[in-house]
Swiss-Prot record:
Catalysed transformations (reactions): 2-(N(omega)-L-arginino)succinate = fumarate + L-arginine
GO molecular function per UniProt: argininosuccinate lyase activity
SUPFAM superfamilies attached to this UniProt entry: L-aspartase-like
Name this protein carries in UniProt: Argininosuccinate lyase
Organism: Staphylococcus aureus (strain bovine RF122 / ET3-1)
Amino acid sequence: MSNKAWGGRFEVQPEEWVDDFNASITFDQTLIDQDIEGSIAHATMLANQGIISQQDSEQIIQGLKSIQHDYHQDQIQFSASLEDIHLNIEHELIKRIGDAGGKLHTGRSRNDQVATDMHLYTKKQVQDIIALIKSLQSVIVDIASNNVDTIMPGYTHLQRAQPISFAHHIMTYFWMLQRDQQRFEDSLKRIDINPLGAAALSGTTYPIDRHETTALLNFGSLYENSLDAVSDRDYIIETLHNISLTMVHLSRFAEEIIFWSTDEAKFITLSDAFSTGSSIMPQKKNPDMAELIRGKVGRTTGHLMSMLMTLKGLPLAYNKDMQEDKEGLFDAVHTIKGSLRIFEGMIQTMTINKERLNQTVKEDFSNATELADYLVTKNIPFRTAHEIVGKIVLECIQQGHYLLDVPLATYQQHHSSIDADIYDYLQPENCLKRRQSYGSTGQSSVIQQLDVAKQLLSQ
């Protein structure tokens, strides 16, 4: 007799190497808790509907709980010949409790069973990711709150552009992560749907109660169409997209951490606990954690592209191609959760070199726009002011000094309206004070921004 759940139809059994290719148990045992949770809800409902006896239901539930316990104690070894987590659990259940275990699959298919597992798993992981994003955001707010008055050069094209508050700069990533968090939150509406009871594709002739299993499994709603319930993995694609976009934001932040920690910048010093060294160069301290996060975005985006291509041409209902939805999602979830934890620890323990940052903006031309704006206050058209300042900057470069070093007489050679107050006007801290537009880098605006962020975190 075949040990396959579908063996009655077949005269020849697959060889072991074919079983290995077909099996998913090496990775889908990740779903054991979700599979057992779904099975307990199904067994409870079957008994309540009079489809199986209460005694059989109780035996099934106790058997499932014992399997779950023993699995987590490393006392169960699953078999590739049984293909997947569903059939391995069912086989073990029948071995433990006898014929009652064979009644569990009444009114259910592996098609709706695996869909239920994946919905439960994805929901839990998205909730975990949201919590990790919020935790990282909280650290960003703490760092920003302590650096409202720390000034640094802002960049465009990776060239110094205008002085900005370090707090304003780092809060940029708070808002990127806030949108990421919102995307995950919104996606829960499309993840938190119960497919259990859809069976293979057309529902079942048994008088099941899908509303009961929806409540037992704490789903927010249930699929209205049984074929849709088992056919799509759009919620996995959406989750992979949200993971990938969040990883893109972490990658951009990581790139800045890497640059800031260079000897050329020296804006920050990373903790030894989040750095590594070189096997040949004794002096090296490498930002490997940031580099790994920067690199892993390719991994998660690859999983997204893979899943899109897997679903692209599939006919409706279950196809074995859908087995490919798991490893990519599991790995992407593991990757982003690890990346968020590492990033939080990395920035929480880094040292911000405030003196270096404040000095840097006095050794560049990031206050050149301020000089142009100063001329505009003297009723000079901005385009004319831009031309004048460009010539002054060129002279400074040729002579090896900065705008604060230019003698007043030289300024007045370029335009007679420039007075001695220009030196206060060009001080970096005064450049920031004049930025009062909503969402700008001025102190009052940054403090207001932080207040909004703290309110969001408290919700």
